[in-house]
Structure formats: structure tokens, C-alpha cells
């Protein structure tokens, strides 16, 4: 229990006036929990939190829900989304036929090869009702647990497969906005936003009522893969090609399935690094990972602008940023981990 104190120049500090140090107390072990993520995936995890519940997303891993019910009671489970979201309804002649209209471990048969082994865990819906695929048998046959009863057992061309799966990829970004849980970007839908029902975070049953779930895609002349989401006065959307906002049309209008605007604000492009919400601004790393920008609302232009925070010292982050975090106290500091392993703030 002996040690030496030195200042930043390596000079020994005179500790003769310090009180004696003796070992006392023990440090509690940090709580650990098993997760499905590999070390290589850690930096691509995005998350959003509501009280004691946190949702975590990674494009290669199904959505996880971390719940704390006591200081030493934590659970990490797969999020059980209800009735969606789904891809567009089938437009081919392929039919689906369920063996039963209700129950678990029921057979669903496709008229042509449609399924893949990576569809296990994926949702499927018909004219009404939906099920979760639990077993892959072949390209035309799977077994599923029916979560909401089907209307019948007749063959139908009116079916849709879930938007999230190991086949299509899983969301790469998430946040809360206007009482909705929002996911963004999968491998097959890189520009799409998936909104839950209002105040019912895991219910993704879509419709046209104001509180219903909804899916919208960024319409642009380039592919703008969504990198991150942030909920502020508008929903901020960081993409590879630029920065967008989504909000309800009209002054102070809520975002609904029939009232949504998505507008581009700037063209800098974003890295896949979780943004930082600081006061009334959102700090993000530009696509090349060498600049930090703050996305802030500008009353003069009635839009969001993103000035360069590193313009006076661009050499500091020249090697590239891989992680960032915000310290509130005792001083307000944005800390960045660089590709060379150093940390700057």
C-alpha cells in the first residue's frame, strides 16, 4: 500500500503534509451479465433508455432489452415486439397456408421457396393475425407460434414478413421520440425509420390512427444509410450522406402516420458513433471521423446547423475518433478516444 505521487512533468510531489494512508474498505464487484455481443461488435452498439429499461441495437444482433429491477437484479432479454414492423405486403403469386388459425408450433407452407434458415425468430402476418417463426424446415415450410389468431387456414397471397431478422438484418440505430420507440436502418432497409405506437413502446402494429405505429423512408437522390438517431425538438437523423430531421407537419404538430415531414438540414455525413446530447445541442462525429460537429437549431434560418467544433485545432482529432463521451461535472468536457488509443478532451 505504498505509492509515489508525481505531477504531469514527472516531478515528485511533496506529501509530507498529507495524512497517513491505510487500506480500508472493499470495492464491490461490478455487476456482470452475459450478452450476445462479441468484442468486435461493441463499438457499433447503439442504445436508448427509459428509466430502468434500456434498448440496445446492433445490425447483426436482434434487439435486446436490459432491465433493472433492483441494484443487483438485471436481465438482458430479446425484445418481444408486437405485430410488426413488417416489410411491404407480398405482390407475387406466392401463397401462404397455415395449418391452424391459432396455437403454438403450427406449420406454415409457402407455394414457392420463400423461407431461409435465418428467418427463425422472424414475424409473419396474413390478412389478420400474426405469428413468430420458431423452426425452419425448408424453403417452403416453417413452424411458428401464432401470437394473434389468423382469420382462417385458407391459402392467401396477402402476407408480409417481419422487417427485422437475421435475413434482413436488425436495426442499427434507436432513440425515443414523442412517446415512441424509434428504430432505424437495417441491411435491406438502410434508409427506413420504424416508429412504435404512441406510449406503447414494443407495439409496432401499423395503421392510420394518430397513435398507430408507422414506417417511413428517407426520400433522397442518394442512399443515406442511417447511422444514429437523437430525439430533440425534432427527431435528428444522422446518415452517411447528411443530417435530416423528422417532425410533424405544421407548427408544434405531433408526428403521426398521416402527418410527418422529413427534411435534410446539412450534407456533412456522419460516422457510426453514438451522438452526445449536451444542453440544447447534439454533438456528432463527421463521416471521416476527424471532425466533431454540434447540431443545433438556428432561429434565423428556422433549421438545424452543424458548425465544426474542431476548426481551431483540427490536428487534435486528425488520427480519427472511435468513441466519445460527455462529462458534465466538475467541468463540461467532451472526451474522445482516438484510433491510436489516446484520449483527448
Regions found by a protein language model. Give the residues of each.
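Elongated alpha-helical scaffolds
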Residues: 35, 39-64, 181, 237-238
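Beta-propeller and closely related beta-pinwheel folds
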Residues: 37, 157-331
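Short, surface-exposed terminal/edge motifs of secreted or surface/virion proteins that either
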Residues: 2-4, 58-78, 140-144, 188-195
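Structural hallmark of WD40 beta-propellers
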Residues: 52, 332-334
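Acidic glycine-/aspartate-rich tracts in secreted/extracellular proteins
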Residues: 9-10, 59-61, 148-150, 187-189, ...
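Autoprocessing Asn-cyclization modules and mimics
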Residues: 12-32, 68, 74-159, 305-317
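Aromatic/His-enriched, Gly/Pro-containing loop or helix-boundary segments
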Residues: 8-51, 150-162, 211-225, 263-270
